Curated annotation (Swiss-Prot):
Name of the protein in its database record: Putative adhesin P1-like protein MPN_286
Amino acid composition bias (Low complexity), ranges on this chain: 21-37, 111-131, 157-167
Originating species: Mycoplasma pneumoniae (strain ATCC 29342 / M129 / Subtype 1) (Mycoplasmoides pneumoniae)
Bias kind Basic and acidic residues: ranges: 135-144
Family: Belongs to the adhesin P1 family.
Residue segments, region Disordered: 9-48, 59-78, 93-167
Domain of life: Bacteria
Stretches with biased composition (Polar residues): 38-48, 145-156
Length: 465
């Protein structure tokens, strides 16, 4: 079964076994500041289970008699050990079990985490299924091996949090969406998409320690006003990450925006007058985030969803095939390769235009910065030696970042393919606060199954998205 949703992490694993290692002497961020560790053993970008998913121990073989249920309002979970059920919503609950198996386990009840079933309110008992605002706090008391879990709204033993964004309601059908019994379930497709795009925020463990105070309510920041004084506290959907680290790679480099614009060749667009005069129009898929402006207190990190309401009509046709997962989003087919069992530092994304008459129809390949050994610090990509790359002229004055010759493309049916002399360029001229960073690329993949549009006459490079 799909037991976790991988996403760009910061070296800390949550529910998977992948942990990257950066052999550089610098460039890894810790609580928003560049590490000065010279030992060369800092963790590199890898995958963390910070989204939506489900983990559980398999209780018996499929089709066996060991079938359990979580209650009358929750669907049955064949072969799953309910005592070890770990539900991951990313926005209010996770089960971080200590390695010793004794202390610090989050015993938040299933109904409290999902909003399913009957829960009390000031006006009496009401059904709050699918309403995150109605989730109850749970208090855990331990005496030896005995654990008592009770709902509470105050105290020192809270295991989930009140100060979550009030406007996030991923789906009104949490139990069905989380059951994973129907791989084409529309609600589950919504949860996948929201998790993968980072629209479900995560809780910040600022200390990085696994103790009773690992999640402080004061560290969960959602407003731009709170962000302005210290960006390391940001936990808005566009930047959701664990351990207080800011990871804007999703938006800054791999951001998907509905904005249309133009490229003037290698020199970029806008204020640059030294590039080619040949202007090429580019279009971007209508999913992604708009960065908050640094000079506006009212600016927010906004989810861009033009014409999309996250309904079954907009997000559907979810198909799991081998290690790949794909679903339809508007006019795009979104495919995540190596999704179910991702290797360290790799998760491929293809965006394929579904309109055969679209002259810009193409497949785009996405991969996290672990591939080219970049790390991130407050919106700036850092090279293996901690140097800033891309936005300020790049390494050695170049306006692009050249990947190692060992950069690999992976195709599920054909194995590994080497793409020689690949170059991802980050245009310094086009970067400005408050706007999604363009993906300026001279990518020339040799594999014919990874098509990119040919450059026009006089066009030195092109924005892909």
């Amino acid at each position: 079964m799909l037991d976790y949703i991988p996403w760009i992490g910061n070296g800390h694993r949550y529910g998977n076994d992948h942990r990257g290692s950066n052999s550089s002497t610098s460039g890894v961020t810790t609580q928003g500041q560049q590490s000065q560790n010279a030992s060369g053993t800092e963790p590199a970008s890898t995958f963390s289970n910070v989204g939506v998913g489900l983990k559980a121990n398999v209780q018996g073989t499929l089709g066996g008699s060991q079938t359990t249920t979580t209650g009358k309002d929750i669907p049955k979970w064949p072969t799953l050990d309910q005592a070890n059920l770990q539900l991951w919503t990313g926005a209010g609950w996770r089960n971080d079990k200590a390695s010793s198996g004794q202390s610090d386990e989050n015993h938040t009840k299933f109904t409290s985490a999902t909003g399913s079933g009957q829960q009390g309110s000031s006006s009496g008992t009401t059904n709050s299924a699918g309403n995150p605002d109605s989730l109850k706090q749970d208090k855990v008391d331990k005496s030896g091996d005995s654990v008592t879990v009770a709902e509470t709204t105050s105290g020192d033993n809270l295991t989930n949090y009140t100060n979550l964004p009030p406007n996030l309601t991923p789906t009104a059908d949490w139990p069905n969406a989380l059951s994973f019994t129907n791989k084409n379930n529309a609600q589950r497709a919504q949860l996948f998409l929201r998790a993968l795009l980072g629209s479900i925020p995560v809780l910040v463990n600022k200390s990085g320690q696994d103790d009773s105070n690992k999640f402080q309510a004061t560290d969960q920041k959602w407003s731009y006003t709170e962000l302005k004084s210290d960006q390391t506290k940001l936990n808005l959907p566009a930047y959701g990450e664990v351990n207080g680290l800011l990871n804007p790679a999703l938006v800054e480099v791999y951001g998907l925006s509905s904005t249309q614009g133009s490229s003037t060749g290698a020199g970029g667009a806008g204020g640059n007058t030294g590039g080619d005069t040949n202007t090429q129009t580019y279009a971007r898929p209508g999913i992604g985030f708009k960065l908050p402006s640094t000079d506006s207190e009212s600016s927010k990190a906004t989810l861009i969803t033009p014409g999309l309401a996250w309904t079954a009509q907009d997000v559907g046709n979810l198909v799991v095939s081998g290690t790949s997962l794909s679903f339809q989003l508007g006019g795009w087919l979104v495919t995540f390769t190596d999704f179910i069992k991702p290797r360290s530092g790799y998760l491929g994304l293809q965006l394929t235009g579904l309109d055969a008459n679209d002259s810009d129809q193409r497949e785009l390949i996405w991969a996290p910065p672990a591939l080219n050994r970049l790390s991130w610090q407050l919106g700036q990509p850092l090279g293996p030696r901690g140097e800033c790359v891309g936005f300020q002229g790049g390494v050695g004055g170049s306006s692009s970042v050249r990947l190692a010759s060992s950069y690999k493309y992976h195709h599920r049916n054909e194995g590994y393919l080497i793409g020689a002399h690949q170059c991802f360029g980050l245009s310094g001229e086009l970067y400005r606060p408050g706007f999604v960073q363009g993906f300026h690329s001279k990518l020339r993949p040799k594999p014919k199954h990874l098509p990119l549009p040919a450059l026009g006459a006089g066009e030195k490079s092109r924005f892909l998205w």
